[in-house]
Amino acid sequence: MSVTAKIIPQEIIRLKRDGKILDEQAINGFVSGLVDGNFSDSQVGAMAMAIFQQGMSIDERVNFTKAMMRSGEVLSWEGFDGPIVDKHSTGGVGDKVSFMLAAIVAACGGYVPMISGRGLGHTGGTADKLESIAGFNVQPSISEFKRIVKDVGVAIISQTDNLAPADKRLYSIRDVTATVESIPLITASILSKKLAAGLDVLVMDVKVGNGAMMNNLDDAKALAQSITSVANGAGVKTQAIITDMNQVLGTSAGNAIEMYETVKYLTGKQREPRLHKIVQALASAMLINTNLASSEKDAREKIDKVLNSGLAAEKFDRMVSALGGPKNFIEKPWDSMKKANVITEVRALQHGYIAQTDTRAIGMSVVGLGGGRTAPTQQVDHSVGFDRILPLGVQVNRGEVIARLHAKDEDSANRAIEQFNNAITYSEESPELPPVIY
């Protein structure tokens, strides 16, 4: 039953709390209240929890997404001679895919206007990672953003006040009210920003596992279905790929150290196999859906060409300098990023195979080090985190190095070492590894 409500915050909250289907007027009232302040922070938190507990129908999700999209500016890309394409990840630990992926697709002829988020819960934020680079401005004007996309082919920025401002407020409150993992809220949050960005094509990386918002495959499939249904229904060609997040992606988790792994990937110095497989799959989907590649084989050849020729690395370097960073970031990344005060090793507590990692716990350990937020206004320490993390399935001896820790002081380092060790489970037999792509 559809219920029409006056725009009184507590009445709209009550309707959803009681499991009613909100009509367009009620949804528009909530979204307007996000922007004009008619809903207080506590009321927004209560509404988020009501949606978390009661869910939303597909019609509600479509109306919610469109209302949040219309809460600000909607970008137009007239005069561009190639497809406008983006990728979005539901988030995980060590997920630096956006950086190499955007550079690869831009090098292949796509235009990638990527509007990224901050850290959310235990997951790292793309915008936070870019701010590891001295001078990098993640909040240029919209006109400057469009100019860089046209000139370079790619620009990665943080959410602006102009695009889906309703979501910007909701996103920050979800982070501190335990309402991150709601499929309707995730769907509307992602797609309001992506639809406002004026995309032709969107590729979704839906993470599944103990380091993802979606812990099990059924939930991941439900989210993928929700996003593709709402997005394709709104006129944006969208494909979702479900990828594993039962361990840290790549070999690092943090901010500056993930940017360094990105540089090593783009320059060919280090391409961790799972990370490379996911980058290839997502890049192929972006190229095929935009008709920049005619087949999977054609896409893979184009990806290899721009990586091996250095063109993708050049695109990333140009984007960094265009957005205020140094002109030679790829060549000398640590000249413009802060290193941690304490760098030490995490050693295995026993002999055996690394059978499981509590990936969420590792993400929360990075947050505890200062590399993420426990409150929306908190400052991030870009220097902290873990790198040289060994993957699942590796056999180690007691005392062998399984990761390296970057911390601001000895006390936080000791806590993080204990947390990392507690997150590792060993086995005597070689474990069965989860698939990289489902």
Curated annotation (Swiss-Prot):
Alphabetically ordered keywords of this record: Glycosyltransferase, Transferase
Glycosyltransferase in keyword set: yes
SMART domains (UniProt xref): PYNP_C (SM00941)
Pathway the protein contributes to: Pyrimidine metabolism; dTMP biosynthesis via salvage pathway; dTMP from thymine: step 1/2
Its EC number(s): 2.4.2.4
MF-aspect GO terms: 1,4-alpha-oligoglucan phosphorylase activity; thymidine phosphorylase activity
Cellular component terms (Gene Ontology): cytosol
Pfam (any one): Glycos_trans_3N
GO BP terms: pyrimidine nucleobase metabolic process; thymidine metabolic process
Catalytic activity, reaction form: thymidine + phosphate = 2-deoxy-alpha-D-ribose 1-phosphate + thymine
Keyword 4Fe-4S (UniProt): no
Family: Belongs to the thymidine/pyrimidine-nucleoside phosphorylase family.
Subunit relationships: Homodimer.
Its job: The enzymes which catalyze the reversible phosphorolysis of pyrimidine nucleosides are involved in the degradation of these compounds and in their utilization as carbon and energy sources, or in the rescue of pyrimidine bases for nucleotide synthesis.
Protein name (database record): Thymidine phosphorylase
Gene behind this protein: deoA
